[in-house]
Amino acid sequence: MTAVLDTLVAVRRTAMDLLARREHGRVELTRKLRQRGAPPEMIEAALDRLTEEGLLSESRYLESFVSYRARSGYGPMRIREELGQRGLQRSDIDLALRECGIDWQEQLRDVWQRKFAGRFPADARERAKQGRFLSYRGYSMDMISRLLSGRGMDD
């Protein structure tokens, strides 16, 4: 049975329940609360209060999302696009990607080794296949070219 979100307390409780599961951005939390039938003015009031109390933090959400997606093997371009679709500011996204402490070239190499067992492409067709996969994962063509030509290999 779904709770009725007709009071500020109910909206706040639902928002806190969602935040207890994982970090959320303000836009995402607003969308979820609206789907549950909460009035927009109550949503804004509840989220403003949660932000003041430090329970809702865009920077914490960005850090958590970047870390999670990077551990899943996604690159900075894909992560940037996903966060943009979630309504976050481009400048905040770029800052989070710069400050996350992830070596993207190393991350790319790990993804490539897991998928292709460290085998360099033997021909143009295989090179295109590997490049497409890595590009879809969110790595730049420059990084991919460096890796597949052997210039990105330190070990």
UniProtKB/Swiss-Prot annotation:
GO biological process: regulation of DNA repair
Pfam families assigned to the protein according to its UniProt record, in alphabetical order: RecX_HTH1, RecX_HTH2, RecX_HTH3
Classification of source organism: Bacteria, Pseudomonadati, Pseudomonadota, Gammaproteobacteria, Pseudomonadales
Keyword Aminoacyl-tRNA synthetase: no
Keywords: Cytoplasm
Matching PANTHER family: REGULATORY PROTEIN RECX FAMILY PROTEIN
Gene Ontology, cellular component aspect: cytoplasm
Gene that encodes the chain: recX
Domain of life: Bacteria
InterPro entries named among the record's database cross-references: RecX_HTH_1st, RecX_HTH_2nd, RecX_HTH_3rd, Regulatory_RecX, WH-like_DNA-bd_sf
Subcellular location: Cytoplasm
Protein name, per record: Regulatory protein RecX
Family: Belongs to the RecX family.
Keyword Cytoplasm: yes
HAMAP family: RecX
Functional summary from the UniProt entry: Modulates RecA activity.
